[in-house]
Regions:
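Short amphipathic alpha-helical interaction segments
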Residues: 2, 35-52
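Short acidic, hydrophobic short linear motifs in intrinsically disordered regions
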Residues: 19-34
Length: 104
């Protein structure tokens, strides 16, 4: 499994398991993400790569959380890079008002 696939798996965890206002620690996120056990080093690299995305707020050792003001960038990333379809995006990310700005 490559790093990009793991980044997408981690994004799925953040979208489905977020706790408003609280960052999710790396060990919790990686424990919920789907990847083969032998890819632990790649998963840690993927988590570090995700920290630098514009739709993620990095809280250092406390973990990461989604940036509510950057849902457009998150949705575009999930659609373009992770293969999420429009239906799932609209189902999972309900409080976004810029759907007409997404490049489908």
């Amino acid at each position: 499994m490559d790093e990009q696939a793991i980044v997408c798996s981690i994004c799925r965890v953040l979208v489905t398991s977020h706790d408003y206002g609280k960052p999710l620690p790396q060990d919790v996120v990686l424990g919920k993400a789907s990847f083969p056990a032998h890819n632990g080093a790649t998963a840690k690299a993927a988590f570090d790569a995700l920290r630098r995305k514009p739709f993620v707020v990095d809280h250092g050792k406390r973990g990461v959380q989604l940036d509510n003001s950057q849902f457009g960038a998150l949705i575009q990333f999930l659609y373009d890079e992770c293969g999420w379809d429009r239906f799932e995006l609209e189902l999972r990310i309900k409080h976004f008002e810029g759907w007409n700005e997404i490049r489908w």
